Amino acid sequence: MESGCGLGTLCLLLCLGPVVGFGVDPSLQIDVLSELGLPGYAAGVRQVPGLHNGSKAFLFPDTSRSVKASPETAEIFFQKLRNKYEFTILVTLKQAHLNSGVIFSIHHLDHRYLELESSGHRNEIRLHYRTGSHRSHTEVFPYILADDKWHRLSLAISASHLILHVDCNKIYERVVEKPFMDLPVGTTFWLGQRNNAHGYFKGIMQDVQLLVMPQGFISQCPDLNRTCPTCNDFHGLVQKIMELQDILAKTSAKLSQAEQRMNKLDQCYCERTCTMKGMTYREFESWTDGCKNCTCMNGTVQCEALICSLSDCPPNSALSYVDGKCCKECQSVCIFEGRTYFEGQRETVYSSSGDCVLFECKDHKMQRIPKDSCATLNCPESQQIPLSHSCCKICKGHDFCTEGHNCMEHSVCRNLDDRAVCSCRDGFRALREDNAYCEDVDECAEGQHYCRENTMCVNTPGSFMCICKTGYIRIDDYSCTEHDECVTNQHNCDENALCFNTVGGHNCVCKLGYTGNGTVCKAFCKDGCRNGGACIASNVCACPQGFTGPSCETDIDECSDGFVQCDSRANCINLPGWYHCECRDGYHDNGMFSPSGESCEDIDECATGRHSCANDTVCFNLDGGYDCRCPHGKNCTGDCIHEDKIKHNGQIWVLENDRCSVCSCQSGYVMCRRMVCDCENPTVDLFCCPECDPRLSSQCLHQSGELSYNSGDSWIQNCQQCRCLQGEVDCWPLPCPEVDCEFSVLPENECCPRCVTDPCQADTIRNDITKTCLDETNVVRFTGSSWIKHGTECTLCQCKNGHVCCSVDPQCLQEL
């Protein structure tokens, strides 16, 4: 439970004062009837006279209707309510006798975030809501609201503090677990019903309002006292302190980490660099790599194609490629016998006598140079080849490439008879005419691939790949055929579905006895599963603990079947789906609440005044009871005293405030019991036993919509006992034994909490804000606060009434 205002009454004692003429800021007010646009909005709801003439009133009759806010209107409501913990529900109503209906409901899927209900069957007002621990909770207020009379009702919620007023009288004030108002998208708002099929309110409603402000009941009853500050104010102050503590702890941790990093940074200078082909480049440094301009940016090499500029060359020069460079540059030239030669280029000329003369281009002139001595060739003369740039011959097959070449990446050197040339590798094209630089050919984009149907072409350096489309498998490098996912078990069908192969995919169909879309199939039970049971296979129900039968329709009586052995001072009480050991009359629990009743101890009725002995007798305490003893020599009447009134011995009467309970006086003892409903008795009181009314034969539809119940039938659903009466479903929380302890836990799949001694195991704690914890960094934490343990990322710690409880989140560890 969230921390209340210290003790439950602390908020009331801080500041009291009358407030007169209380005004309401329109931005904090939701006038539900006006916003919904009744009566034209919903068929079957009509305007009628109300308690007063200041606003419209509407009759909600016993007919099918759908009074639901549009998504746009609902979102206007929720924008004011979302994540608010200080608001008041106001309504003026006149509810039909015995009707059990919902005044309004805010719910999403199966979760009721806020719902106000009035039960005429059990004479209760119920508030259903979601808690901060994401559990459903119902707060029950015994009160007769469905009496066909006008009432003004207000329910003020301030964090964990509830105040219920009826007709400007404070009826109840409680400290409860704080509601969770983080309303998700898709939440719906209903008025006068829970949904299209359940919770129909029958009667008249007027002045239905939601005020997002503290103590909004003042607008309905201006003469009431107002508390200051409210519990929500108090919660806010505590929360702010917790947040500041958490910020302080996180800031301290960050400063410590920053200091450690600064100490390391002082010892070195770090600069991002890039590495390419064994060379290291500094940040923002640029260089040329073949026919690409590259730059080091943030430690990554970024390159783009080099664009060569065609400039005019001066006289006696021309453009020519230079080794190691992509673009042509101006080079000196020589003109010799009508041909152009570049600087350093050689040419042979043979005289008429057959002598070889060697010329070389130098300083714009072809100059004769001495010829080199020629090596002796080891091949026949027929295999000897003359060269244009040397007076020496070579043998056929000479390897010019080993003597050096200018072929770059993606280009290979190839030998001809008299020289070496460059050639682009397969899958690459030349960037210039000498093939020294080459680029990849995108066969996919240019349509130069052989990929067939059912494939996708993917370009690779120097080649391409044919990838099979989804649902197909490979035949060869270029072809794919249909893939039968059903045969290879590569489908997403549910285990309870049949797989049917299709072209390029497959279909899933649920097996007989299951329903769903094929990827998700749920078992179907034709008779349904009652009392919270789950259908796990075709017509097979898995029953919750405490129930049995094909449809979980039978409650297991643990008390009569001998499963339970209660202490001699306790009785075994069988309840739908479970049991508990309850102290016998004359005993009460000592506060330990042991499961078997060992903590029951005797009540001294005589000392506490909880006896019914008349004045002419003497009360004598017994183990588990008392005795009204007549003093020696006196003639005692055997009368009883009940609610300060004398009841004669043998007298039977009906309680004034409960016509369905009968009491009797027997020799000084008063015994009361609930009236037994015998529907065979023609004089049965139909007020107390409405299930015996033959006129009320309407059936009820189960909440799941799969089952129908007759009037008078009962069942269990989500830890609530439900009953069908007059065609209406009325549900109330299962009775739980009192748990008056500091720490309690609600076990999984159970409906009632149990006491535990270890606060770290508890999910509900009576928080005491005076008890604090000291975390690992010596920061003081308030009870209820939580934090991530210093030096970890996945260890969450909480302060629970002075105890530090830490646990590791496995999902967090997986995400690291």
From Swiss-Prot:
Cellular component aspect of the GO annotation: cytoplasm; extracellular space
Disulfide bridge map: C401-C413, C407-C422, C424-C438, C444-C457, C451-C466, C468-C480, C486-C499, C493-C508, C510-C521, C525-C535, C529-C541, C543-C552, C559-C572, C566-C581, C583-C600, C606-C619, C613-C628, C630-C636
Expression sites (tissue/organ): Strongly expressed in early embryonic neural tissues (brain, spinal cord, dorsal root ganglia); less in other tissues such as cells around cartilage, myocardium, lung mesenchymal cells, and liver. After hatching expression is restricted to neural tissues including retina.
Domain named Laminin G-like: residues: 65-228
Keywords associated with the record: Calcium, Disulfide bond, EGF-like domain, Glycoprotein, Repeat, Signal
GO biological process: cell population proliferation; commissural neuron axon guidance; fertilization; negative regulation of retinal ganglion cell axon guidance; neural crest cell migration; positive regulation of cell division; positive regulation of neuron differentiation
Protein name: Protein NEL
Species this protein is from: Gallus gallus (Chicken)
